[in-house]
Design a protein with these regions (language model features):
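Short catalytic/binding micro-motifs of nucleotide second-messenger systems
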Residues: 23-28, 60-71, 102-104
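Conserved ABC ATPase nucleotide-binding domain signature region
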Residues: 28-31, 113
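Short hydrophobic/aromatic beta-strand micro-patches
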Residues: 42-44, 83-84
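Catalytic-core segments of nucleotide cyclases and related cyclic-nucleotide turnover enzymes
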Residues: 52-55, 70, 85-116, 120-121
């Protein structure tokens, strides 16, 4: 985005994604920007299927909100990786699994939700 439309457009995308995550998450969830254009959403008391459903809602919500730059509508899409844990889990390990799943989504064609398997960590 930054390379084609400038840093302001990239910043607008970051804000769009952040607002979507805040709007669709619960008060008990944690939304964090982990750097660049990546975010982490921690969903306590949510199973892997529930996380996948929310990730798909987030993906669809963002896809329905194109960015307008210089009177040009620019589609915005996201690739989301989902990972789960039963009980307590190390945040680094969980984040790493979600990141691997996100890269799987990108390799699969972008604008997708992916998880590595159906078993939580």
């Amino acid at each position: 985005m930054n390379g084609n439309f400038g840093n302001d457009a990239g910043d607008q995308v970051i804000r769009l994604v952040a607002r979507c995550l805040q709007r669709l998450s619960r008060a008990s969830d944690v939304v964090a920007r982990t750097g660049g254009d990546e975010f982490l959403l921690i969903l306590p008391h949510t199973d892997l299927d529930g996380a996948r459903v929310l990730a798909e809602r987030i993906r669809m919500d963002i896809a329905q909100r194109p960015l307008v730059v210089n009177q040009q509508r620019i589609p915005v899409t996201v690739s989301l990786g989902v990972a789960g844990a039963v009980g307590e889990a190390e945040l680094d390990k969980l984040s790493h699994e979600a990141s691997r799943a996100m890269h799987l989504a990108k390799r699969g064609g972008r604008n997708r939700v992916a998880s590595l398997d159906t078993k939580p960590i």
